Amino acid sequence: MGFRLITQLKGMSVFLVLFPTLLLVMLTGAQRACPKNCRCDGKIVYCESHAFADIPENISGGSQGLSLRFNSIQKLKSNQFAGLNQLIWLYLDHNYISSVDEDAFQGIRRLKELILSSNKITYLHNKTFHPVPNLRNLDLSYNKLQTLQSEQFKGLRKLIILHLRSNSLKTVPIRVFQDCRNLDFLDLGYNRLRSLSRNAFAGLLKLKELHLEHNQFSKINFAHFPRLFNLRSIYLQWNRIRSVSQGLTWTWSSLHTLDLSGNDIQAIEPGTFKCLPNLQKLNLDSNKLTNVSQETVNAWISLISITLSGNMWECSRSICPLFYWLKNFKGNKESTMICAGPKHIQGEKVSDAVETYNICSDVQVVNTERSHLAPQTPQKPPFIPKPTIFKPDAVPATLEAVSPSPGFQIPGTDHEYEHVSFHKIIAGSVALFLSVAMILLVIYVSWKRYPASMKQLQQHSLMKRRRKKARESERQMNSPLQEYYVDYKPTNSETMDISVNGSGPCTYTISGSRECEIPHHVKPLPYYSYDQPVIGYCQAHQPLHINKAYEAVSIEQDDSPSLELGRDHSFIATIARSAAPAIYLERITN
């Protein structure tokens, strides 16, 4: 019993070791399986530019992307891709596909992107795309499709982008796009469409961009685009459109771009653009327009860009409404509008001709909708004037056409500017208050947190002021008008004369180098007495006046020691200017 159990356990252990290894080898082999002449990158298979006439074999069932571009495939058979149920995108462009079986795409329900452009497809069955309801992007451009079936796109509720460009389509069936509720982009350009049924685009509630250029339309009525509430751009250039009318009972407020260039438009019906209040970009170049009515330019209230070159402008009084509108227009515009008539001004610029020949000098043209102000706020809904908000001296909206447009102003603009200025003043005051409060807070915190530092700063500033005052006082004391110095340095011979005769010459050097002689006795201190100041000051650096003669005193009255002959003596006398002048003599014996 135990032996059997051990044997079974050994067998199970061998199985547990070998099974994962075998599974890993199988998975690795499956991942490495790649068709001949193809390149595999994980779950993406590239079989491009190898002249494949059919779908290659041995493509892994777990592939999520398959590119068969630039090959020689001529036909898509039934269940051609049934084994590729994980496929997310499939590229079949630039082949020679002329027929597609209605069950060709069975089994690839997860497919989100299908590219069939640049082939030779002339017909598609009504149910061709029903097996792929998760499509987001479908490209059928550059084929030879002549018609679309009524249920061609039924069930494609997740479709976002649809390319039908450059085919041979002549009509668009009624409600053919009914189920394409999320369609954002539709390209029908470069076909042979001559007319549109009223409900051709019914159901495209989220459509934002529509291309209809290079077709064969002869007239356009905006009523053919019912309830396209989100459409922002429509391209109708290079058709054969001769007239444009509106016929809408609703306002098409979402449309921002309208391209009508390269057509045969000779005139625009009055009121055509009234249903497009938010139109920002309008292309009317390369048509046959001779003039634009006043009612038409009045409806261009939100334009920020316009092209008008290449038309047959008649430079007469009928051009004046457009001329004045362009003169006040602040957006992007062309300056190459050329006169086609009258004969004598053919080839001249419209603006130059009007000003040179005074064509509009006696014509009063107005703009009731203020289109020249629209570029300042292109994204906002247009301002519709109401008589109730006008100033007392303003005219009603219905009679606005009486006054010229250059002087027109929006009511309430001054008040808006006043509010803006008031807000700026408040903001500036608040900013100033916060700045001062911040400075005071920093000072207070510094004073509280570092009191010693604040005291040192105060002491430093006080010492600085004291030093400054001391320097000023010293500068005043050292002025040349404050003190005078008189030096006396007798020579040896003069000393002998003084000793023998009792008198002799002496030299007083005062600023200005003035000299005088005074009698000098051997004992100088007792000999000086005066009733009035000895020195009289007239002006600064004036000659020194001696007011008192020197009188000798008897030897008996002198108790001071006498000078000895034969010795060198020097006397220095200093005279200082003070309230009571006095003369001091200091004797120095060398």
From Swiss-Prot:
Side of membrane Cytoplasmic, spans: 446-590
Subcellular location(s) per record: Cell membrane; Postsynaptic cell membrane
Signal peptide coordinates: 1-30
Assigned keywords, A-Z: Cell membrane, Glycoprotein, Leucine-rich repeat, Membrane, Postsynaptic cell membrane, Repeat, Signal, Synapse, Transmembrane, Transmembrane helix
Functional description taken from the UniProt entry: May play a role in the development and maintenance of the vertebrate nervous system. Exhibits strong synaptogenic activity, restricted to excitatory presynaptic differentiation.
Protein's membrane topology: Single-pass type I membrane protein
Domain called LRRNT: residue spans: 31-61
Name recorded for this polypeptide: Leucine-rich repeat transmembrane neuronal protein 4
Pfam family, one: LRR_8
Alphabetized GO MF terms: heparan sulfate proteoglycan binding
Start and stop residues of the LRR repeats: 62-83, 86-107, 110-131, 134-155, 158-179, 182-203, 206-226, 230-251, 254-275, 278-299
Extracellular compartment spans: 31-424
InterPro entries: Leu-rich_rpt, Leu-rich_rpt_typical-subtyp, LRR_dom_sf, LRR_TM_domain-containing
Transmembrane segments: 425-445
Family: Belongs to the LRRTM family.
Primary localization class, coarse: membrane
Recorded name of the encoding gene: Lrrtm4
KW Transmembrane helix (keyword) present: yes
Organism in which the protein naturally occurs: Mus musculus (Mouse)
Organism domain of life: Eukaryota
Domain named LRRCT: residues: 311-362
Glycosylation sites: N58, N126, N291
